[in-house]
Amino acid sequence: MRSSLVGSEMCIRDSYPQFGGPTTASTFDALSDELQGQRWLPDLRFVSSYHDHPAYIKAIADSIREHWESHGRADKLVLSYHGMPKRYLLEGDPYHCQCIKTSRLVADELGLSEDDYMSTFQSRFGRDEWLKPYTDETLQGLPEAGVKSLQIICPGFSADCLETIEEIGMENRDYFIEAGGERYEYIPCLNATANHIDSVSYTHLRAHETRTHR
């Protein structure tokens, strides 16, 4: 990137649907550092989040529907997001609110009631209080509450990684089964599906249209 830039416009969209200071903002900071020293810059447009974009919501909902078609529905759908210290929320970071909105919109798209789904937060570490409810503790308590089968998805990840495959797909499955659960299914991330590619295209298109119609 430091060699040269071509074109009149540049649209930057990272792979984090929900905006977070430690993720999205730090990505934009790193990009700004890379742009320093350029002799010329195109018009820049940052897509700060797409947590509520209809194409993204539909892509998540469709992946859940496809799983239901093959495996049937479970007692509970859990939408688990990467956690962060609660102090970020108290300082005004919109991440938590955007995660909750994503879950609500996906549930609306699927026609779910509030009892059918829940949002949780994973991967905490250290001594600080993190966003709640915690995924691991929640899954350990669900069987006692009568939930014997669940399906879990991570809408905050564009593609599967060690965190989703091992922590959510394996470790948390053990927590649920050992606590008395009977059926645990991890629904993969969007990865390279056609719906995901379409949602990327639509968010870029909206960013361009927003700029040209200002």
Q: Whereabouts are the PLM-identified features?
A:
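Single conserved hydrophobic/aromatic residue that forms the stacking wall/gate
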Residues: M1-E9, H204, R211-R214
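Extended amphipathic ligand-handling, pore-lining, and cofactor/metal-binding catalytic surfaces
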Residues: S8, R13-R206
